[in-house]
A protein has these predicted regions:
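Outer membrane beta-barrel
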Residues: 26-35, 46-167, 177-179, 186-194
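Transmembrane beta-barrel architecture of outer-membrane proteins
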Residues: 95-97, 166, 179-181, 201, ...
Length: 337
């Protein structure tokens, strides 16, 4: 067991054993993802991806307060996942998504440490943990979460966050000088029209799987130097909601860029039914046409209850850096007490 893995175990024990007298909120959520579909390329499939495998898990969330209000928030979210595309001995693993503590310093300032979103783009302000449609994060940074420390504060009417992380994503390892520095400044999440500006600099690793335990093998032993600037926005327009982001920069000197636009519509006669359309583009080498991905994805989402949601999506690759594909996915997602 590595030093970092031992630290996570100690953190979890402390997390659970903190005194109950100062608990303001204490919730234990259960989670399940059942997903499958049909692909032109692979025929009947489970979804091979960074966060959409079949899985069961939980989220344990606690908030602590004193006479002056809440001062500490702790969150652990993990799941046992199954990847049907792997051999039996490699098909199961544990994904630690959230494992962080955040301490309020007052005046809108706080400090966070653990496993959390890098401060870049839409991912820190959206919950895409169990959804079919994803942000640019996995293609842009290479992962959605990383291990490290972050500081949040206020700059006039804007929120800002600065994060320093180890550049490994889900896995708990550093190699070849990996690190990740990110920052984002944007409007408060309570605003009807939200927008943000982000910056990124680092050397990141790419894992062959998204497991935290066991630690996945690296695709390459060398880290990739990344520089990015990005913009993002969200806007509620009556029954419509619009999300968009774009990022550009370089990977080891190669120009990279991409964008995502997503439009959602809530059916007025059936508020539990939502229709979404997403276009996502990413190029890992702007000068090489074969390095680009462009996917169109309409998704129908129906909320069965406050805890269960059914999603049906069609993903059509217009361009792909690997083999172009068309696939239909059906997902049942449960998240409740």
């Amino acid at each position: 067991m590595t030093v970092i893995q031992r630290s996570i175990l100690i953190f979890s024990l402390i997390f659970i054993s903190l005194p109950q007298g100062i608990v303001k909120a204490n919730n234990f959520y259960k989670e399940a993802v059942i997903i499958g579909g049909y692909s032109d390329r692979d025929q009947w499939i489970g979804k091979k991806g960074k966060s959409l495998k079949n899985s069961i898990g939980f989220e344990y969330y606690r908030k602590f307060a004193n006479d002056y209000g809440d001062f500490l928030t702790l969150d652990v979210q993990m799941r046992m996942a199954y990847d049907s595309t792997e051999d039996s001995q490699d098909a199961f693993g544990i994904e630690v998504h959230n494992a962080w503590a955040e301490h309020k310093l007052g005046l809108g300032r706080s400090i966070r440490f653990g496993h959390f979103d890098p401060a870049f783009g839409l991912e820190p302000v959206l919950d895409t943990h169990g959804t079919l449609l994803q942000t640019l994060a996995s293609k842009n940074i290479g992962f959605k979460k990383d291990w490290g420390i972050a500081y949040k504060g206020l700059l006039g009417d804007y929120d800002y966050e600065i994060a320093s992380q180890i550049g490994s994503g889900m896995g708990i390892k550093r190699k070849d000088g990996s690190f990740l520095l990110t920052s984002r400044i944007g409007t408060p999440q309570t605003s009807e029209f939200q927008y943000g500006l982000s910056f990124l600099y680092g050397q990141t690793l790419q894992s062959s799987q998204s497991w935290t335990i066991p630690v996945s093998d690296l695709v390459s032993g060398k880290s990739v130097r990344k520089k990015r600037i990005g913009i993002d926005m969200q806007r509620q327009l009556g029954l419509f909601d619009l999300k968009a982001e774009a990022a550009a920069g370089d990977n080891d000197g190669r120009t990279v860029a991409g964008g995502m636009v997503e439009l959602g519509y809530t059916v007025p006669e059936q508020q539990n039914l939502k229709i979404k359309m997403q276009t996502l583009y990413w190029s890992d080498d702007w000068d090489e046409k074969k390095a680009r991905d462009l996917t169109l994805a309409p998704v129908i989402e129906y909320k069965i209850s406050s805890s269960a949601t059914m999603r049906l999506g069609y993903f059509h690759d217009i361009y792909s850096s690997s083999d172009e594909d068309k696939l239909i996915l059906l997902q049942l997602y449960y998240f409740g007490l």
